[in-house]
């Protein structure tokens, strides 16, 4: 009896899934096996023709053609705004909106014909097609022109507004005379026989120190009208050349201003200039002035001759 009870309490016998499926009518699905990397997937039979070598070659060519067509379409899409602008400009030009006049403003020293020659390259061109920046870039190549603005005045006029550089000095270097502005920028060459009434600066880099020279001369206003030229020596100090023929050698740096003021006071009391001296040496701050007397009477130099005066040489 106990044996039978134990038999009834035991777990039911495990049935096979396949047998259970046959009894219940269910369908058993096999688990999918993962595809290995070195295996290939077979195409369906109706797509088998794609594996033909000729079709593969045609597919490659078709892909190449599509890439080229796409590239050309991109180029066309990038150019069409420019083409549209060009066609619009040409249409406006046919309606009378083309360059027929050039107006120049702000020109005082430079030759006007040079400006006209540049602007005339746009003559009869449709106004919208005029390249204003190209005209401005060509104008800025001239030494006289510091800035330029080119604009359209409808219907048919180009306006060129010029800002000229102000000449500040004549720079002598290696025997050549050049007109420069206060920043040392070369404006134009200078005819030695028609030199303008401007200060003469001599030597390498002298054109780049005009502002410092101006401050130096302002310290001795009584001497400033008497000074004809200034030589920049060794890229560190000035020699001042007086119209009466003397040369004053100044020390370097900030000591130059004090030395020039001192010389101005001594000259006011003792009249050092136009007394036959050739050179005054004040290169040593605080030391007595060393003066050299000319063996011959000093001749006052004229403006064109000072560039060739051996006392005013740029070979330093």
UniProtKB/Swiss-Prot annotation:
Residues 81-316 are periplasmic. The chain crosses the membrane at residues 62-80. GO terms for cellular component: cell division site; plasma membrane. Residues 97-165 form the POTRA domain. Its main location: membrane. Residues 1-34, 295-316 are annotated as: Disordered. One of its GO terms (biological process) is cell septum assembly. Coiled coil: none annotated. It is a single-pass type II membrane protein. The keyword Transmembrane applies. Residues 1-61 are cytoplasmic. The keyword Membrane applies. It is found in: Cell inner membrane. Keywords: Cell cycle, Cell division, Cell inner membrane, Cell membrane, Membrane, Transmembrane, Transmembrane helix. Essential cell division protein. Belongs to the FtsQ/DivIB family. FtsQ subfamily. This is Cell division protein FtsQ.
């Amino acid at each position: 009896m106990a044996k039978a009870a134990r038999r009834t309490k035991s777990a039911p016998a495990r049935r096979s899934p396949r047998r259970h499926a046959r009894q219940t009518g269910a369908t058993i699905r096999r688990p999918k096996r993962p595809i290995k990397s070195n295996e290939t997937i077979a195409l369906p039979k109706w797509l088998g023709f794609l594996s033909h070598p000729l079709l593969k070659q045609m597919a490659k060519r078709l892909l190449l053609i599509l890439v080229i067509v796409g590239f050309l379409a991109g180029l066309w899409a990038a150019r069409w705004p420019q083409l549209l602008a060009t066609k619009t400009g040409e249409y406006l030009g046919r309606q009378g909106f083309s360059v027929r006049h050039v107006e120049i403003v702000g020109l005082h020293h430079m030759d006007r014909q040079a400006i006209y020659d540049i602007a005339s390259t746009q003559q009869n061109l449709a106004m919208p097609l005029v390249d204003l920046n190209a005209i401005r870039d060509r104008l800025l190549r001239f030494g006289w022109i510091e800035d330029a603005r080119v604009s359209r005045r409808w219907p048919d006029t180009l306006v060129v507004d010029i800002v000229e550089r102000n000449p500040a000095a004549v720079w002598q270097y290696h025997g050549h005379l050049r007109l420069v502005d206060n920043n040392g920028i070369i404006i134009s060459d200078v005819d030695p026989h028609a030199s303008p009434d401007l200060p003469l600066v001599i030597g390498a880099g002298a054109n780049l120190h005009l502002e410092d020279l101006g401050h130096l001369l302002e310290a001795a206003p009584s001497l400033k009208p008497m000074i004809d030229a200034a030589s920049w020596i060794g890229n560190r100090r000035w020699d001042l050349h007086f119209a009466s023929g003397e040369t004053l050698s100044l020390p370097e740096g900030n000591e130059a201003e004090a030395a020039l003021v001192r010389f101005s006071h001594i000259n006011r009391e003792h009249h050092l200039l136009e007394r036959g001296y050739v050179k005054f040496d004040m290169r040593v701050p605080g030391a007595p002035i060393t003066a050299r007397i000319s063996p011959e009477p000093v001749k006052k130099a004229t403006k064109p001759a000072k560039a060739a005066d051996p006392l005013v040489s740029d070979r330093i």
